[in-house]
């Protein structure tokens, strides 16, 4: 487990800023302690420094996971967020989308959000902006990328895609063997 390089940190923070903006600093400087990001097997983990010090006694090849996995770097060195980061992204999300109860299941199966399933959307959401998807009961379901801006959504036909699917809580079941 090692600290991220400058290039890796930049790629990860650019991806996180699409979803939570300048609230990234709230992830690192928390009132309950200092947290940091560490890389292990191409996966980025979010862990408190107190637990990180305890993990130094474990051999690197024996360590499977530590803290919360925020995402991983692909072979082309792009950062991809995992659904395990949802609990940390949702409270700080700048742009949100609420889906109707009938569209929740479709989203949780890995499909995009259609206009017919859109309940609400945050004002001034621009196209290709990172959004957190909520149920109408304000339960975070996953995250995605806005396919259309808020103004364009008002004029769309019901079968048009509004949010491109990125990750959802259904992945805990669909990919339980590969999530760490």
UniProtKB/Swiss-Prot annotation:
Keywords linked to the UniProt accession: Nucleus, Ribosome biogenesis, RNA-binding
GO biological process, one term: ribosome assembly
Subcellular location: Nucleus, Nucleolus
All residue ranges annotated as the PUA domain in the record: 94-170
InterPro entries registered for this protein in UniProt: NIP7_N (IPR040598), Nip7_N_euk (IPR055359), PUA (IPR002478), PUA-like_sf (IPR015947), PUA_sf (IPR036974), Ribosomal_synth_fac_NIP7 (IPR016686), UPF0113_PUA (IPR005155)
UniProt xrefs under PANTHER family: CYCLIN-DEPENDENT KINASES REGULATORY SUBUNIT/60S RIBOSOME SUBUNIT BIOGENESIS PROTEIN NIP7
Protein's recorded name: 60S ribosome subunit biogenesis protein NIP7 homolog
Lineage: Eukaryota, Metazoa, Chordata, Craniata, Vertebrata
Gene: nip7
């Amino acid at each position: 487990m090692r600290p991220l390089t400058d290039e890796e940190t930049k790629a990860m923070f650019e991806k996180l800023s699409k979803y939570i903006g300048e609230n990234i600093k709230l992830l690192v400087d928390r009132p309950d302690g200092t947290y940091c990001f560490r890389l292990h097997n191409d996966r980025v983990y979010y862990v408190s420094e107190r637990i990180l010090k305890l993990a130094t006694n474990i051999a690197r090849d024996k360590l499977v996971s530590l803290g919360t996995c925020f995402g991983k770097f692909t072979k082309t060195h792009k950062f991809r967020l995992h659904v395990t980061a949802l609990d940390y992204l949702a409270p700080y999300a700048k742009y949100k989308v609420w889906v109707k109860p009938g569209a929740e299941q479709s989203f949780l199966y890995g499909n995009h959000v259609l206009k017919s399933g859109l309940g609400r959307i945050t004002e001034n959401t621009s196209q290709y902006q990172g959004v957190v998807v909520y149920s109408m009961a304000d339960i975070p379901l996953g995250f995605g990328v806005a396919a259309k801006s808020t103004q364009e959504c008002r004029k769309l036909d019901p079968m048009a895609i509004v949010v491109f699917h990125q990750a959802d809580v259904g992945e805990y079941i669909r990919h339980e063997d590969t999530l760490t």
